[in-house]
From Swiss-Prot:
Protein's cellular compartments: Nucleus; Nucleus speckle; Cytoplasm
Biased composition (Basic and acidic residues): 1-13, 51-62, 132-166, 201-218
Region of interest (Disordered), residue spans: 1-179, 201-220, 259-284
Keywords per UniProt: Coiled coil, Cytoplasm, mRNA processing, mRNA splicing, Nucleus, Phosphoprotein
Cytoplasm listed as a keyword: yes
Post-translational modification: Phosphorylated.
Name of the molecule in the record: Serine/Arginine-related protein 53
PANTHER family registered for this protein in UniProt: SERINE/ARGININE-RELATED PROTEIN 53, SERINE_ARGININE-RELATED PROTEIN 53
A GO biological-process term: nucleocytoplasmic transport
GO cellular component terms, A-Z: cytoplasm; nuclear speck; nucleus
Length: 334
């Protein structure tokens, strides 16, 4: 009998629950939506409570208490309905929020990251600036080369035009003159051109002589350096003996004096023959000249002033011929 009564009680209880659910399903749907929007913070608590109630093992005492509450007061049923409707509404709002968050995450994933984009754009812009700067430098170099070439071409053209203009001006200037004066003017121009050519040749010879002299000086400096090194080695050696100092200038003067004496003896009578000066032999200090000697013949004027007039004119004529040859042929006058 106890079992049958408990079965009937359970059936009646399940029927009541179904009725309550049907009634509350229509009325509480709108309330649950508004209530879930206002109070979304209590969702986790009600959910945990409902889950804990469902998971707890049901006993006879728990069933009796529940029956007593439902039969004694209808407030519990209304509270139950409200809590269920709230949990449903909250579940819907949670689903909506979750779907929104998922869609946001999908959008954020689908969108390219701004940092990576900015880095790639910075790299590409850096590469572009590098390539642009290189192109600018290349263009500048090409422009400079073109300008230099144009300047050189302009200078060559100017020189060519100047030469042409000079020849044209000469011809135009000589046209109005008589033939004799034209010949004189042309001869004068030829002489000027020859003089310019002679000056150019002389300058070339001077440059060559200077180059030779520099080479000789370099060679002499090398010889002097070797001699200096040997002298230093001799001084540093143990067999070195200190001697009195003699300057090289005095030795050079003595050599020059001996050369002058040798020239004087050769110009004198042929019977007198002087020995050639030897640089290796030591020169006596008595032979070194200490004063300047002048070759004075007690003459008040130069001997050319005492030449006859015909001889002087002849010499002057020869001098003019030599100068003319120098201007025409470019050969230097002796």
């Amino acid at each position: 009998m106890g079992r049958r009564s408990s079965d009937t009680e359970e059936e009646s209880r399940s029927k009541r629950k179904k009725k309550h659910r049907r009634r509350s399903s229509s009325s509480s749907s709108s309330d649950s939506r508004t209530y879930s929007r206002k109070k979304g913070g209590r969702r986790s608590r009600s959910k945990s409570r409902s889950w804990s109630r469902d998971l707890q093992p049901r006993s006879h005492s728990y069933d009796r208490r529940r029956r007593h509450r439902s039969s004694s007061s209808s407030s519990y049923g209304s509270r139950r309905k409200r809590s269920q409707s709230r949990s449903r509404g909250r579940g819907k709002s949670y689903r909506v929020q979750r779907s929104r968050s998922k869609s946001r995450t999908r959008r954020s994933r689908s969108r390219p990251r701004p940092r990576s984009h900015s880095r790639s754009s910075e790299r590409s812009s850096h590469r572009r600036t590098r390539s642009r700067s290189r192109d600018r430098e290349r263009r500048k170099g090409r422009d400079k080369e073109k300008r230099e070439k144009e300047k050189d071409k302009g200078k060559d053209k100017e020189l060519h035009n100047i030469k042409r203009g000079e020849s044209g001006n000469i011809k135009a200037g000589l046209e109005h003159l008589p033939p004799a004066e034209q010949a004189k003017a042309r001869l004068q121009l030829v002489l000027e051109a020859a003089a310019k050519a002679d000056e150019a040749l002389k300058a070339k010879e001077r440059n060559e002589e200077e180059a030779k002299r520099r080479k000789e000086e370099d060679q002499t400096t090398l010889v002097e350096q070797v001699k200096r090194v040997k002298e230093i080695e001799a001084i540093e050696s143990d067999s070195f003996v200190q001697q009195t100092f003699r300057s090289s200038k005095e030795i050079k003067k003595a050599v020059e004096a001996s050369e002058v004496k040798h020239a004087a003896t050769t110009s004198g009578p042929a019977s007198v023959v002087a020995d050639p000066p030897s640089n290796e032999k030591e020169i006596d200090p008595s032979n070194i000249p200490t004063a300047i000697k002048y070759q004075d013949d007690n003459s008040l004027a130069h001997p050319n002033l005492f030449i006859e007039k015909a001889d002087a004119e002849e010499k002057w004529f020869k001098r003019l011929i030599a100068l003319r040859q120098e201007r025409l042929m470019g050969s230097p006058v002796a």
